[in-house]
Amino acid sequence: MNFHPCYPVDHGVPSWILVLLLSLGLCNLQARADRVLDPDFHENYFEQYMDHFNFESFGNKTFGQRFLVSDKFWKMGEGPIFFYTGNEGDIWSFANNSGFMVELAAQQEALLVFAEHRYYGKSLPFGVQSTQRGYTQLLTVEQALADFAVLLQALRQDLGVHDAPTIAFGGSYGGMLSAYMRMKYPHLVAGALAASAPVVAVAGLGDSYQFFRDVTADFYGQSPKCAQAVRDAFQQIKDLFLQGAYDTISQNFGTCQSLSSPKDLTQLFGFARNAFTVLAMMDYPYPTDFLGPLPANPVKVGCQRLLNEGQRIMGLRALAGLVYNSSGTEPCYDIYRLYQSCADPTGCGTGSDARAWDYQACTEINLTFDSNNVTDMFPEIPFSEELRQQYCLDTWGVWPRQDWLQTSFWGGDLKAASNIIFSNGDLDPWAGGGIQSNLSTSVIAVTIQGGAHHLDLRASNSEDPPSVVEVRKLESTLIREWVAAARLKQPAMPRWPGPKKQHPSR
């Protein structure tokens, strides 16, 4: 297994630098992350096996798995490796929004590695066809974890640090993967920080109404009047639709197409509901650009927009604009282009990455969440296991394995695991689907008061709530202890004592 040939973006890079990087098996694409503490990431490709578990179908065929690496803070031979298990998107997006890892690497003299998940970003086993039906058979959690394990071993060997203690990091689905890495490959990973990892929910456990109930709670907590206004807006849309006033809905909400069928109404409801999901997840106390440009405290801003409009449907339109029209240049909402219904009711996004995630939600990742207009403020949009099965058969020709993650990765019964931190923010609607209490002395749960989706992974900010500052201190301490313990467990090099002394016979 060798690193993929590199193609430098900046052809003016001195040749001696490229030679040095190539000698390490690392080829520089001169890409950088924009952070307060700049890690100076270099983009690389690794020749990764297409199929780790079948010796016949693809043999030794490989694809280019992208990863980012920074040795800016690394004390070679002594510092640990901090390894981000990439999730459902371009790896640069996660690297640019995980500043805590950079800060921690500077403190603990660690090598930083961000590994892209197969089928996402530029890590495409079948090129541009990868996310088309008929080419997705190698997209599984298990294959992705094996990618990470093989890449990590190759890096260690190439850099001559076979025993460097490694800590896995990840957020959301990536947080699930970091925990799974510790569980499946404990000989490679000494511990894991699993931020906002919904390991219980995605295993098909828990309450199907939990997610949208918790999104509602975020807005109700900001303003009970806001939550009621949301209910009123959706009800007005429904009433107008039943009256056949399709043009009125389109004019007030600003859709590009006039609604004409129940399918259009459901699409509009899903489109609007998704805006609330994004605002709740991204409810950070400062402006961000993770899932798109958002202001500080976007839930508060969204409620202000909604309540400032005298007409409720127009208020709903103004709130949705935070997500779908941040530039203010969209003349209307193309609800079928901007939002695509999929096997994840919380939203898949659009484009190739969205198709890959849709497939995963049709196979191993169980996301059967409903809104019911009783425990939440949204229209009734059911998504049962039966509906999931039919959608997945029609779309991908696959039958979901409803309980597979309970079998393969233990569901919520993780007492036998060790050295995992499950962190959640109390503002994050995913928190209710994760581990929320300590399972043992080394599998611990921490809650960030005033924290949204994996806030602790983000770089330190003067607007951070005090709780996340304390949580990061705890995480830093535990990670340092895990690294130290892993070093103590490393076997000493055996020494040959020499020939036994022969005693003369008596």
Swiss-Prot record:
Catalyzed chemical reaction(s): Release of an N-terminal dipeptide, Xaa-Yaa-|-, preferentially when Yaa is Ala or Pro. Substrates are oligopeptides, preferentially tripeptides
Glycosylated position list: N60, N96, N325, N366, N373, N438
Catalytic residues, chain numbering: S172 (charge relay system), D428 (charge relay system), H453 (charge relay system)
Single Gene Ontology BP annotation: proteolysis
Primary residence: other
Subunit structure: Homodimer.
Name assigned to this protein: Dipeptidyl peptidase 2
